[in-house]
Amino acid sequence: MPKLEMMLLVLLILPLSYFSAAGGQVVQGDWRGDGLARYLQRGDRDAQGCQVVTPGSKWGRCCLNRVCGPMCCPASHCYCIYHRGRGHGCSC
């Protein structure tokens, strides 16, 4: 089998879901998982930790970026995530 045919065969077998439209590797995970968490893993969109609003309180306001609005979390080490079907929530 010539090299060109072999290369085409390999490219057809290679799963396209591993690559984005720009040619880079996609963040792996199941398609039913939290889409916002996968979005934040790409590039420089890292989630920021919760900031305590009231001194002495365990609750804070979680600010990710313009995608996710402010919300409350049970501890300062939590961060906002989005669960498909369940909406925004905190992961601690």
Swiss-Prot record:
Keywords: Acetylcholine receptor inhibiting toxin, Disulfide bond, Hydroxylation, Ion channel impairing toxin, Neurotoxin, Postsynaptic neurotoxin, Secreted, Signal, Toxin. Its main location: secreted. Expressed by the venom duct. GO terms for molecular function: acetylcholine receptor inhibitor activity; ion channel regulator activity; toxin activity. It comes from the Eukaryota. Residues 1-24 form the signal peptide. Residues 25-45 form a propeptide. Disulfide bonds join 63-72, 68-80, 73-90, 78-92. It is found in: Secreted. The modification 4-hydroxyproline is found at residue 55. The keyword Signal applies. One of its GO terms (cellular component) is host cell postsynaptic membrane. Alpha-conotoxins act on postsynaptic membranes, they bind to the nicotinic acetylcholine receptors (nAChR) and thus inhibit them. Through its two C-terminal domains, this homodimeric protein would bind to two nAChR allosteric sites, located outside the nAChR C-loop of the principal binding face and at the adjacent binding interface in a clockwise direction. This toxin specifically blocks mammalian neuronal nAChR of the alpha-7/CHRNA7, alpha-3-beta-2/CHRNA3-CHRNB2 and alpha-4-beta-2/CHRNA4-CHRNB2 subtypes. Hetero-, homo- or pseudo-homodimer (identical sequence, different post-translational modifications). The cysteine framework is XX (C-CC-C-CC-C-C-C-C). Belongs to the conotoxin D superfamily. This is Alpha-conotoxin-like Mi20.3. The lineage of its organism: Eukaryota, Metazoa, Spiralia, Lophotrochozoa, Mollusca.
